[in-house]
Structures are given as C-alpha cells and as structure tokens.
C-alpha cells in the first residue's frame, strides 16, 4: 500500500470514528461499482448518507473540500443511484451527500464535516 493510500485509509478511519461518535451508523465502507467508489455509506436516523472523505497534506493545489468538484459530485451521485438500486431496502429513504474534509496532520481538530455538501 502506498503512502497516499495509507493516508487515505487513516483519514477514512478518522471520519468514520467522528461520524459514529455523532450518532451515524455504518452501512457500507468502500462500496465499489462501475461508476467509482463510495467511501462511507451511513445512516443518520432514517436518512441514508453518502460520505466522501477527502484528505490533503497541504493546500498548494486546493484544499480537501475544493477537490470535490462538479465532475466528482456527478460520479458520487451515479454511484449512490447504483447503491440504492443494489440495496432496494434503502431506496425509499431520504438521502444526502456529506463531505468530510481532513487536512494534515489528520487529527480530529483538522476535520471539517459538511452535511448536505451538494444536491443531487
């Protein structure tokens, strides 16, 4: 595993812990499909939450939050649609897209959780 992949996995673990501590329940982690991957799929009450976790060591080319551009949002929306098709149990539940942006050194204080980060 590369250093970048290791940092990404650590960021996902930090995000998962933070969201779980905030009352969300994990449904899936790293769910893959032809449109890409959903980092975390969680349940907040009865709302299915698709969480994109972004980690940036530095902001020279933009921060973690800015890296979730329109193209990335479209891929996440398509992946979420495929998830809901594959898991019909959740298809009638309300959904939202959250982003957890983490900047180095990757401590809880460096975590920014944006609920409803974008609309589908």
Curated annotation (Swiss-Prot):
Matching InterPro entries: Restrct_endonuc-II-like (IPR011335), tRNA_endonuc-like_dom_sf (IPR011856), UPF0102_YraN-like (IPR003509)
Name of the protein in question: UPF0102 protein PST_1070
Family listed: Belongs to the UPF0102 family.
Entry-linked CDD domains: PoNe_Nuclease
UniProt cross-references to Gene3D superfamilies, sorted A to Z: 3.40.1350.10
Pfam families: UPF0102
GO molecular function per UniProt: nucleic acid binding
């Amino acid at each position: 595993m590369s250093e970048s992949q290791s940092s990404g996995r650590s960021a996902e673990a930090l995000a998962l812990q933070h969201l779980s501590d905030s009352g969300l329940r994990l449904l899936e982690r790293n769910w893959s499909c032809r449109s890409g991957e959903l980092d975390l799929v969680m349940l907040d009450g009865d709302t299915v939450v698709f969480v994109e976790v972004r980690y940036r060591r530095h902001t020279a080319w933009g921060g973690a939050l800015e890296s979730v551009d329109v193209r990335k949002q479209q891929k996440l929306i398509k992946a979420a649609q495929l998830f809901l098709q594959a898991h019909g149990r959740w298809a009638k539940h309300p959904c939202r897209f959250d982003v957890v942006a983490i900047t180095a050194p990757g401590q809880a204080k460096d975590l920014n959780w944006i609920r409803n980060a974008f609309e589908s």
